[in-house]
């Protein structure tokens, strides 16, 4: 047994891992317990334009009815899971100040992140940008959950040789302060796309002198939850206006 394995085993005995959703003990160190894991729903059959699982998206045209009605500024969107049940509980806990939860959920993003980077043709010259919080919200929460999620996922990829080899063009650079939220926006609950888009209009901009770091580059915009696409669309608009080559969106979960 290696020293690392011995240390990890000892820590597990002293402080056993607990389910991210319900706090039950998970002796094998998994993120969710045996009772909560079955509730996780991998997102399948989703529209490549907005990541919404819909029966009306046309495989030939590649977009659903929503995407054809709304001219999103991002070129595609994907999510790892449907938002609900145990994952929703864990995300809510994360947003209520549990920073360690963001780091723990990060590995769930790895497969979808690898897929997004490969399909989008990303390389070392491109950038990953987390959706920013407003400065006031960041002070209240103490961290940006989107940043913590994608940072943990990228760290997992960088530490796994097989995953690094699968990215021959290299991993894109994480830009944590490239985009900023210029004003606070209201929580809109179950509001529809039109109301959400009106609320976030003009709420995002590039940081001063940041345009050079995005111009002619592919951008992967990452958030914890994709709801209607309004926030991602506004962020993508600011990035495209600064000269980004294109913007792809990735979320841990998609509200359906």
Q: What name fits each language-model region?
A:
Residues 1-256:
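Glycine-rich phosphate/pyrophosphate-handling loop used in enzymes and phosphotransfer proteins
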């Amino acid at each position: 047994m290696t020293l690392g394995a011995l240390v990890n085993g000892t820590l597990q005995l002293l402080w056993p891992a607990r389910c991210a959703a319900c706090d039950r003990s998970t002796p094998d160190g998994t993120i969710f317990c045996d009772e909560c894991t079955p509730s996780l729903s991998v997102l399948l059959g989703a529209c490549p334009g907005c990541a919404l699982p819909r029966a009306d998206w046309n495989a030939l045209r590649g977009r659903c009815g929503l995407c054809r009605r709304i001219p999103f500024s991002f070129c595609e969107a994907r999510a790892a899971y449907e938002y609900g049940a145990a994952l929703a509980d864990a995300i809510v806990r994360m947003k209520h100040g549990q920073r360690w939860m963001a780091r723990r959920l990060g590995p769930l993003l790895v497969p979808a992140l690898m897929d997004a980077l490969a399909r989008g043709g990303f390389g070392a010259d491109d950038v990953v940008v987390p959706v920013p919080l407003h400065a006031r919200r960041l002070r209240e929460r103490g961290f940006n959950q989107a940043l913590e999620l994608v940072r943990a996922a990228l760290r997992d990829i960088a530490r796994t040789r097989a995953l690094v080899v699968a990215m021959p063009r290299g991993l894109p650079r994480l830009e944590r302060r490239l985009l900023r939220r210029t004003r606070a926006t209201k929580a809109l609950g179950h509001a529809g796309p039109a109301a959400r888009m009106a609320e976030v209009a003009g709420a995002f901009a590039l940081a001063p002198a940041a345009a050079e770091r995005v111009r002619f580059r592919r951008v992967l915009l990452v958030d914890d939850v994709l709801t209607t696409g309004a926030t991602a669309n506004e962020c993508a608009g600011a990035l495209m206006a600064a000269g980004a080559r294109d913007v792809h969106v990735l979320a841990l979960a998609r509200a359906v």
